Amino acid sequence: MRINPTTSGPRVSTLGKKFQGRIAQIIGPVLXVAFSTGKMPNIYNSLVVXGRDTAGQEINVTCEVQQLLGNNRVRAVAMSATDGLTRGMEVIDTGAPLSVPVGGATLGRIFNVLGEPVDNLGPVDTRTTSPIHRSAPAFTQLDTKLSIFETGIKVVDLLAPYRRGGKIGLFGGAGVGKTVLIMELINNIAKAHGGVSVFGGVGERTREGNDLYMEMKESGVINEENIAESKVALVYGQMNEPPGARMRVGLTALTMAEYFRDVNEQDVLLFIDNIFRFVQAGSEVSALLGRMPSAVGYQPTLSTEMGSLQERITSTKEGSITSIQAVYVPADDLTDPAPATTFAHLDATTVLSRGLAAKGIYPAVDPLDSTSTMLQPRIVGEEHYETAQRVKQTLQRYKELQDIIAILGLDELSEEDRLTVARARKIERFLSQPFFVAEVFTGSPGKYVGLAETIRGFQLILSGELDSFPEQAFYLVGNIDEATAKAMNLEVESKLKK
């Protein structure tokens, strides 16, 4: 692993005077810096402005070179606020791209875009660092085998399975269980795959980032007593950050994930919330740099920027990075260039439904709207495919009958339709599941359900063998044996009441 100079702390002052330039112009978060002839920095090099403002406060602003303007000038985008900077201030070229700490030292900690800890838990070991700008793995390194990434969550594994090293779009509004689903996936990958997770908060609310951190500590995903046993590293670039930080924070998180994949040879889960904010920040930077806008005001390099991030998220022969990306769709317009460009990269979509959340069915994953390219007989096998299709058909028929039931009632349906409705309601409830990370709130122990068990359970419901069981027996259980046991208990309880 190449060790690069870090862009913060006392080490910067040791860089030779030959790397120095001066601020020539400041336009918001964009700086034009003049260097002497022959000392020009490269594109993506990290520059540091160190000095004092007019009030005597110390300034340490890191920038990234974006354009070489000619006349020995470069244009750079600041990664933090440019308050207090003045023309003529000294700028130091670090001679390398922005580098961030990687490895086990990052687990359980919160970082900003520069790889600096922001959780008040002391310094982080920076002996091993990695540059945030890297090329995607070569074709010869890629693992092209199509394999399912088992999550232990029934509705996901059966109806919209994730691909190992794939990219999943997570669509969900506020309060439908997105955070809990994210935390459960982080927990399950750590237990079942011995993997770790990296969470990149791109342009999200500071409050949401804080809530996620607190909930992770409460559920044990972050171990406060022994921080090294934590299962996740967090990287935040919130809404209040300059566009440069929001544009690069996704790369910082990805760089940390790549180290776990390439060096530790682990399966890594990378969460990006929200991928739209990455595009939005890129659009702001593009406008500040004076580029001609493209369709709907987006940057002309939209596809290139998205591609350079997404192509690094992949499986290699060493390990895999499976990415789950929250996708905001502006004005619910799926043809908007930002979501449209994102969809081109996704292998699966997990849609969270407010209707299911209102019924108390968690995880509130919509079984009919969620899709996956992996749900093909040649990949998942005939048995899995047939079971998934029959489950979807049953739920679709139930959806079609709901209007009739609402107007005329259940008694007006044919015998066959009544049976379909009864089975669909059992399936709907069996798609719910108690989560490990929700134990502290619900009091019921979490369940990890293997794919074979999931398929067996739904086959039994579809075959009609469990038609005599009450539908509440299928609610918030793990495998089908638990539902059977619950049905027996309910029967005993009802007899005792009589």
Curated annotation (Swiss-Prot):
<dbReference type="InterPro" id="IPR020003">
    <property type="entry name" value="ATPase_a/bsu_AS"/>
</dbReference>
<dbReference type="InterPro" id="IPR036121">
    <property type="entry name" value="ATPase_F1/V1/A1_a/bsu_N_sf"/>
</dbReference>
<dbReference type="GO" id="GO:0005739">
    <property type="term" value="C:mitochondrion"/>
</dbReference>
<dbReference type="Pfam" id="PF02874">
    <property type="entry name" value="ATP-synt_ab_N"/>
</dbReference>
<protein>
    <recommendedName>
        <fullName>ATP synthase subunit beta, chloroplastic</fullName>
        <ecNumber>7.1.2.2</ecNumber>
    </recommendedName>
</protein>
<dbReference type="GO" id="GO:0046933">
    <property type="term" value="F:proton-transporting ATP synthase activity, rotational mechanism"/>
</dbReference>
<dbReference type="GO" id="GO:0009535">
    <property type="term" value="C:chloroplast thylakoid membrane"/>
</dbReference>
<dbReference type="Pfam" id="PF00006">
    <property type="entry name" value="ATP-synt_ab"/>
</dbReference>
<dbReference type="GO" id="GO:0042776">
    <property type="term" value="P:proton motive force-driven mitochondrial ATP synthesis"/>
</dbReference>
<dbReference type="InterPro" id="IPR004100">
    <property type="entry name" value="ATPase_F1/V1/A1_a/bsu_N"/>
</dbReference>
<keyword id="KW-0139">CF(1)</keyword>
<keyword id="KW-0406">Ion transport</keyword>
<keyword id="KW-0813">Transport</keyword>
<dbReference type="InterPro" id="IPR005722">
    <property type="entry name" value="ATP_synth_F1_bsu"/>
</dbReference>
<dbReference type="InterPro" id="IPR055190">
    <property type="entry name" value="ATP-synt_VA_C"/>
</dbReference>
<keyword id="KW-0547">Nucleotide-binding</keyword>
<keyword id="KW-0375">Hydrogen ion transport</keyword>
<dbReference type="GO" id="GO:0045259">
    <property type="term" value="C:proton-transporting ATP synthase complex"/>
</dbReference>
<keyword id="KW-0067">ATP-binding</keyword>
<dbReference type="InterPro" id="IPR027417">
    <property type="entry name" value="P-loop_NTPase"/>
</dbReference>
<keyword id="KW-0066">ATP synthesis</keyword>
<dbReference type="InterPro" id="IPR024034">
    <property type="entry name" value="ATPase_F1/V1_b/a_C"/>
</dbReference>
<keyword id="KW-0150">Chloroplast</keyword>
<comment type="subunit">
    <text>F-type ATPases have 2 components, CF(1) - the catalytic core - and CF(0) - the membrane proton channel. CF(1) has five subunits: alpha(3), beta(3), gamma(1), delta(1), epsilon(1). CF(0) has four main subunits: a(1), b(1), b'(1) and c(9-12).</text>
</comment>
<keyword id="KW-0472">Membrane</keyword>
<dbReference type="InterPro" id="IPR050053">
    <property type="entry name" value="ATPase_alpha/beta_chains"/>
</dbReference>
<dbReference type="InterPro" id="IPR000194">
    <property type="entry name" value="ATPase_F1/V1/A1_a/bsu_nucl-bd"/>
</dbReference>
<comment type="similarity">
    <text>Belongs to the ATPase alpha/beta chains family.</text>
</comment>
<feature type="binding site">
    <location>
        <begin position="172"/>
        <end position="179"/>
    </location>
    <ligand>
        <name>ATP</name>
    </ligand>
</feature>
<keyword id="KW-1278">Translocase</keyword>
<keyword id="KW-0793">Thylakoid</keyword>
<keyword id="KW-0934">Plastid</keyword>
<dbReference type="GO" id="GO:0016887">
    <property type="term" value="F:ATP hydrolysis activity"/>
</dbReference>
<dbReference type="InterPro" id="IPR003593">
    <property type="entry name" value="AAA+_ATPase"/>
</dbReference>
<comment type="function">
    <text>Produces ATP from ADP in the presence of a proton gradient across the membrane. The catalytic sites are hosted primarily by the beta subunits.</text>
</comment>
<dbReference type="GO" id="GO:0005524">
    <property type="term" value="F:ATP binding"/>
</dbReference>
<dbReference type="Pfam" id="PF22919">
    <property type="entry name" value="ATP-synt_VA_C"/>
</dbReference>
